[in-house]
Amino acid sequence: MTLAVKVPLKEGEIVRRRLIELGALDNTYKIKREGNFLLIPVKFPVKGFEVVEAELEQVSRRPNSYREIVNVPQELRRFLPTSFDIIGNIAIIEIPEELKGYAKEIGRAIVEVHKNVKAVYMKGSKIEGEYRTRELIHIAGENITETIHRENGIRLKLDVAKVYFSPRLATERMRVFKMAQEGEVVFDMFAGVGPFSILLAKKAELVFACDINPWAIKYLEENIKLNKVNNVVPILGDSREIEVKADRIIMNLPKYAHEFLEHAISCINDGGVIHYYGFGPEGDPYGWHLERIRELANKFGVKVEVLGKRVIRNYAPRQYNIAIDFRVSF
Ligand SMILES: C[S@@+](CC[C@H](N)C(=O)[O-])C[C@H]1O[C@@H](n2cnc3c(N)ncnc32)[C@H](O)[C@@H]1O
């Protein structure tokens, strides 16, 4: 037996919406028709409605999406985000202004549907600052920010509040791994907690992994142990000040990578490959970056061969996160 609001058939939809607004609708039971009435399952007695005890059928199918069970007013449902990131057992979601008042409902629904998710955070700012982190606002589940994320066969321990990490780049990291050759020396200029470095360590002879964020380096050191790799050298500092020679350089700092190009070219070995990342506008997202690369190639008197370029993902409206791979020959 469960509690249900009994309403005339023709008022059913209006009452259902009202119950959603009140957070009273119990989605775990099905609505039942009884003659000219509907029995709408509720979580608690609701003032102003006739509440009865009823035998209702339980909803047996496990929902596929939090959107199927979340209690938000019908007219706002169209604003519900269709995707969010899951990093280890932590979900991070961008909630539009219209739904900010329902953030906790959304968080609760995510925890309910995704059994592996233990904590949910709402994005509280854009990615900003030198460390490329953002403010996170806790909306559901446990108040934890440290987790272990699995991707491409490696484990990455990290704190989502203290370091940059995006699970959306997993395919890009695998693509770079596939391009890498056995026995190379790699310079990961903006290593973070090591998703490129640790993966590439499986092929490379040596990986220099630099980051300016002490938390990133702390987790990188833990991840080196966690993944039992012995050829990654963590370096805390500004990668412009690190003088190494490498066959492959990864420049995963899209917002500022162009400022580091000169140093990258000075670190690359003859015939080496640079994986450059940037942001660019719709239409020609590569043009500005390719010009910078060619300018510097002229300045250094080296040859540049573009091996590939692609859009990785949308970054903002009409702005793309792009990648350019190029070979440098002396
Ligand atoms: C976009 S994140 C990429 C992290 C990592 N490659 C990944 O895929 O998760 C850029 C990283 O560059 C680091 N960073 C920013 N400026 C730097 C600098 N001058 N030298 C070294 N690292 C820097 C930030 O702390 C941040 O961890």
From Swiss-Prot:
S-adenosyl-L-methionine binds at residues 173, 211-212, 238-239, 252. GO terms for biological process: tRNA methylation; tRNA N1-guanine methylation. It comes from Pyrococcus abyssi (strain GE5 / Orsay). Belongs to the class I-like SAM-binding methyltransferase superfamily. TRM5/TYW2 family. GO terms for molecular function: tRNA (guanine(37)-N1)-methyltransferase activity. GO terms for cellular component: cytoplasm. InterPro entries: MeTrfase_TRM5/TYW2 (IPR030382), SAM-dependent_MTases_sf (IPR029063), TRM5-TYW2-like_MTfase (IPR056743), TRM5/TYW2-like_N (IPR056744), Trm5a/b_N (IPR040601). The lineage of its organism: Archaea, Methanobacteriati, Methanobacteriota, Thermococci, Thermococcales. The gene is trm5b. Specifically methylates the N1 position of guanosine-37 in various tRNAs. The keyword Ribosomal protein does not apply. It catalyses: guanosine(37) in tRNA + S-adenosyl-L-methionine = N(1)-methylguanosine(37) in tRNA + S-adenosyl-L-homocysteine + H(+). This is tRNA (guanine(37)-N(1))-methyltransferase Trm5b. It is found in: Cytoplasm.
